[in-house]
Amino acid sequence: MAQAAGVRRQLDSLTRNIFLRDVGRTVPEKSGAPLTGDSEVAPSVSLQIFLYFNAFYFPFWWVCYVIMLQLKYVLLPDYYKFILVVLLILMSVIEVIRLYLGYSGNLQEKVPELAGFCLLSILLQLPLLLFLLCDPGLEPLPLERAVHGILTAFLLIQIPISIFALRKATRHLAGRFHLLGDLDGRA
């Protein structure tokens, strides 16, 4: 029986090292008291700062984009007119959803919302912005390059920060799940 207790301690130590590495203070220590639903939420402050600035910058970007589109609309071929109007609508909807998912995922430490924020940023918003910046057929104006460049810079900074925040939230929730199993006697 003593040998089984030693094996159990070794396995417990191993699982703590695997699942609770880099979790730090966000996971409460095993104290014998039942784990309640109230736990410490650790949002990424740097991601929140960039989301805050992005939320204020986005209306300015939208107004500049509409003004620049109106100024050069007569100079563009028909297919570019269609593409730019569709891009304006798509990017506006995606950006609003992306910012909402970023705020709720980061502040409430919700992994699906934070993952959705990362996916929308990488798979949709970044390629659309790079198209607006790099396609010479759009005849970009200097103001247009500047506002698209700033929004792209925000996006390129937010992507790695959000990936780290997602990893941190996932580890935190995995640690809580592991602790719940320990406290219930199932693990």
Curated annotation (Swiss-Prot):
One of its GO terms (cellular component) is ciliary membrane. Pfam families: Transmemb_17. The chain crosses the membrane at residues 49-69, 82-102, 114-134, 146-166. It is found in: Cell projection, Cilium membrane. It is a multi-pass membrane protein. The keyword Secreted does not apply. Keywords: Cell membrane, Cell projection, Cilium, Cilium biogenesis/degradation, Membrane, Transmembrane, Transmembrane helix. One of its GO terms (biological process) is smoothened signaling pathway. Belongs to the TMEM17 family. Transmembrane component of the tectonic-like complex, a complex localized at the transition zone of primary cilia and acting as a barrier that prevents diffusion of transmembrane proteins between the cilia and plasma membranes. Required for ciliogenesis and sonic hedgehog/SHH signaling. Part of the tectonic-like complex (also named B9 complex). This is Transmembrane protein 17A. It comes from Xenopus tropicalis. The lineage of its organism: Eukaryota, Metazoa, Chordata, Craniata, Vertebrata.
